[in-house]
Amino acid sequence: MNLRLICAFWAATGFLCGQTSAKKLAESDCTAERLGASIPKEAIGEPVAAVTLSAPVWKPAAAPLPAYCSIDGSMAPVETSGKAKPILFRVLLPAEWSERAAQLGGGGMNGMIPNLTMAFGVTTGSGLIERGFATYGSDSGHGMAASDWALSDESIKNLGYMQLKKTHDAAMVLIQRAYGPKPRFNYFFGTSQGGREGLTVAQRYPADYDGIIANVPIVSFSSLMLAPELIRIQEKPLANWGTPAKVNAIRGEFMRQCDKLDGLTDGIINNYMACIALFDIKQGKKGRDPWAGKRCPGNRDPDPADTSAKACLTDGQISTLEMVYSPYLFATPLANGVKQFGMWVPGTDPSGSGLILPGRFSGQEGAAPDAQMHRHLGVIGVTGFLMQDPTANPLDYVEGGRWNQRRIELSEWLDSTNPDLSKFAARGGKMIVTIGTNDTLASPGAQLDYFQSVIDRMGREKVDQFARFFVIPQTNHGLSGMNDTTDGDGKTIEPAPIPNAYDRLPILMDWVEKKVTPPKQLTVTGGGRSLPLCNYPLYPKYVGGQASDAGLYICAR
């Protein structure tokens, strides 16, 4: 057999002729001859029609980034309808490789390859390329412009989970072609949609990853896309509309009842679980009324335009608040037996991300004849994925109605709610998850429900051996936040940032690579202050002294 035939045989299996095991990559290695023009579809663990590679591009060192080789690829869909789109992916191969790799998750509804030279919310120190990581990610199988992909089951499943495996497997082939061996340690880092993707790979592909950082994961993705419509459906009767004028009254009532629950009246609701229990009408004694002090006498609002914290709320407005701050029960259990969507946690941003809106929409009482249909970031998941008609009115959804079977199917594809992480734990995998309770873009209620489901399934002791479920109270989708400038006693106080900074990457790397188990309580800093970072369901309880010092708090239940 001549050399050309030998090289052709090895290329078909994913390896190129002449490659050697090495940690260094030179510009002369960043070529199609070395890295190839395609990858066999058999090397990809989920179905693809073909994998093609673009010509590699060498990026010279430019501070703070070292030199690296960038290669793009495209995975053709199996579906032939034309609605399914190719997955576009990219792999960055550093000149000095540390035998580590990291897959970076997306954001929003995806649609673009993430910036692989950065890792938001992962480290406060040197970046991944600077540390010698090979990094990789994809657009998940659709672009930002066209929407017909939302009518393709393959594209929806790509978004939900398949693109993660496909991109991983393609990246592993290219890393081996570049350096020889596979990575000693492979990680996944993501925030928001990327956080959900981090949970997804632990649940679906546990053998592929050693460590995961997942920030503010949109755990119950299918329900999160539907939830804004559920609120607008609740508000179909004009009497149920919670107007923007009532935001200060709602915020003030949350603060009045919950600020003091952590031992300190400071404009921060640290004891989030106790606050949830107060305003979740499905908990506690039947018929109790956490909003009694805000009800308009005789159910008549004397001044609907009153924007003060003293404004009253009508029975209809309170019924909507009860819906938003209590779990939403499904007509039929969804994937993994999930029976409810946790909705939102009482906080200082009751109108955030469209929880409260100023107008009326098509299908609601009092809407103008030419009123627009309600639209939001994830509405394509309702009209496209669920109703399979992008022109449909999302407010036509009925729980348990004609779309119920499709709802269950989408949940299987999109939701990252499997509580059984035993395979990930058994292979030595570690994860750090961080959420904020003032997050109106994701659902803190659903995140907390997921944490509890994992603990219920696996046991607290086992979970603590491989996972940390950290909660930073009163922080938003970016894990930042401020104290409210009116505390629970109604006093005006100075605004100050809530401490939120901690360096996740070295903690996770030490846990994975050196078996150094992190404590269950860390410290977050910011604005000249510090607070304990507590593992769910604990919270920072004030025990006395200078309130800006983490040492004067304990993590308590």
Regions found by a protein language model. Give the residues of each.
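Cap/lid segment of the alpha/beta-hydrolase catalytic domain
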Residues: 107-180, 226-227, 391-413, 475-494
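Alpha/beta-hydrolase fold nucleophile elbow
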Residues: 181-192
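Catalytic-loop region of hydrolases
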Residues: 19-100, 113-115, 122, 265-269, ...
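Conserved alpha/beta-hydrolase "acid-adjacent" motif
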Residues: 441-445
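Hydrolase active-site cap/lid region
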Residues: 204-207, 211-248, 271-273, 352, ...
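Short beta-strand/loop motif that positions the catalytic acidic residue
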Residues: 433-435
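Short glycine-enriched nucleophile-adjacent loop
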Residues: 195-206
